[in-house]
């Protein structure tokens, strides 16, 4: 909702369809939860649940997240080519460094949060420190800094604010809780402060409401034995075909994600399906990342598609159309978890750097092929059989079966030669 207010109208202004602009925004926004170094809240819960350092979670998520955003970029680029859109002149592009020079201090909470996470502190402690510093900057920093008329004094002030916040490290969580109580007292007597406290209490109430169905669902599934039955069913199916077990797990994540937020979805599915996948030989982090990914993809998947329907009023388009576009744009989010199960090197779980490089190479080619097949454009508009050709070639590259890589690469090379020759006949300038 925050970034969409800016990005969706901007894309529509440059000629993108409203449904496509909404789909891009929904896809990119959900991608923030899987992109290190600061991922979604589920990543912190995962770190605590499986007792794995947050750094390892980030390492496992890095390559898939990059591939996810490459897919989104590829779709936007190909759609621009299909629709004949052009970019704005370079002199009209905004300067991000000017904004950084003006408000550089606002990245202090993020920088400290990342430092603490990679320094080995727990996600809970790191998040609390980052949140405390954010509150200090919002409620005190902006007001006090205006009293300093020169830029050097302002810079010194912000450095002192950061150093003051860092002193909380040696006192632990008690100091942060004390600071929160102190600020609550200050806000109670400050002008407009009681409204702020009301917002904070409403946020806590929302968190409790989101947590309530988790306990109910897990309790019902555990007490009735359904959880054990479901896990056993996944294992039984996996003995004959692990692919079917993965599909079943994916469907459960998507269905649960249609009714509950991502965090409760992960907590439930990680307690049901992840242990079953682990018993079938899927590495620990990958089994949890699998349910994590599809819990996020549920917000892009119709008929519910919460992220798509959130973008609908901004784009002034049907949420269902935006959801269908988002599924097409985020195709990597649906495919990469399967590739990681069959090739753990994609998430840096075993294997050599050559193994990782090779699987990334295959994934990039598959992403490009699926992008062309979905949009219907490469160098020039693609015929229906070329789109089918690209889809089949990508499917062979993703499939973990004997000789599928060779077949997929052969089909890809043949398609590229064919399409290049056709594009050269239609528009020599395109291939010059």
PLM regions and their residue ranges:
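Helix-coil boundary and interhelical linker segments in multi-pass alpha-helical membrane proteins
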Residues: 47-63, 120, 274-286, 347-349
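Membrane-interfacial loop-to-helix junctions in multi-pass transporters
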Residues: 14-20, 101-107, 205-210, 233-251, ...
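Alpha-helical transmembrane segments of multi-pass membrane proteins
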Residues: 14-30, 57-60, 66, 242-256, ...
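Hydrophobic transmembrane alpha-helices that form the pore/transport pathway of multi-pass ion
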Residues: 1-32, 38, 42, 51, ...
């Amino acid at each position: 909702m925050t970034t969409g207010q800016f990005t969706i109208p901007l894309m529509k202004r440059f000629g993108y369809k409203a449904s496509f602009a909404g789909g891009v925004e929904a896809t990119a926004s959900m991608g923030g939860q899987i992109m290190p170094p600061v991922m979604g809240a589920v990543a912190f819960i995962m770190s605590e649940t499986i007792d794995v350092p947050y750094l390892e979670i980030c390492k496992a998520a890095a390559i898939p997240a990059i591939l996810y955003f490459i897919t989104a970029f590829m779709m936007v680029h190909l759609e621009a080519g299909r629709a004949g859109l052009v970019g704005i002149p370079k002199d009209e592009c905004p300067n991000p460094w000017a904004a950084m020079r003006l408000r550089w201090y606002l990245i202090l909470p993020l920088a400290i949060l990342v430092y603490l996470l990679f320094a080995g502190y727990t996600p809970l402690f790191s998040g609390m420190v980052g949140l405390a510093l954010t509150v200090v900057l919002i409620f005190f920093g902006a007001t006090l800094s205006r009293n300093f008329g020169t830029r050097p004094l302002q810079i010194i002030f912000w450095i002192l604010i950061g150093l003051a916040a860092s002193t909380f490290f040696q006192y632990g969580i008690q100091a942060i809780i004390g600071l929160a109580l102190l600020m609550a007292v200050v806000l109670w007597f400050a002008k407009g402060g009681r409204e702020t406290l009301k917002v904070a209490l409403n946020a806590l109430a929302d968190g409790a409401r989101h947590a309530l169905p988790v306990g109910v669902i897990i309790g019902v599934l555990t007490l009735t034995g359904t959880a054990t039955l479901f896990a056993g069913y996944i294992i039984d199916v996996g003995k004959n075909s692990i692919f079917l077990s993965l599909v079943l797990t994916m469907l459960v994540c998507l269905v649960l994600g249609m009714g509950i937020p991502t965090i409760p979805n992960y907590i439930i599915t990680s307690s049901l399906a992840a242990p079953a996948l682990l018993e079938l030989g899927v590495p620990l982090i990958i089994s949890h990342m699998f349910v994590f990914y599809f819990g996020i993809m549920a917000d892009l998947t119709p008929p519910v598609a919460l992220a798509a329907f959130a973008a609908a009023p901004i784009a002034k388009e049907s949420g269902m159309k935006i959801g269908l576009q988002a599924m097409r744009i985020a195709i990597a989010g649906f495919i990469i978890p399967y590739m990681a199960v069959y090739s753990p090197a994609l998430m840096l779980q075993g294997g050599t750097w050559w193994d990782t490089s090779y699987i990334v190479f295959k994934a990039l080619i598959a992403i490009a092929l699926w992008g062309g097949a979905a949009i219907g454009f490469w160098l020039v508009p693609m015929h229906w059989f070329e789109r089918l050709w690209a889809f089949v070639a990508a499917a062979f590259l993703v499939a973990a079966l004997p000789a599928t890589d060779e077949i997929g690469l052969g089909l890809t090379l043949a398609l590229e030669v064919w399409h290049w020759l056709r594009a050269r006949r239609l528009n020599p300038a395109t291939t010059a």
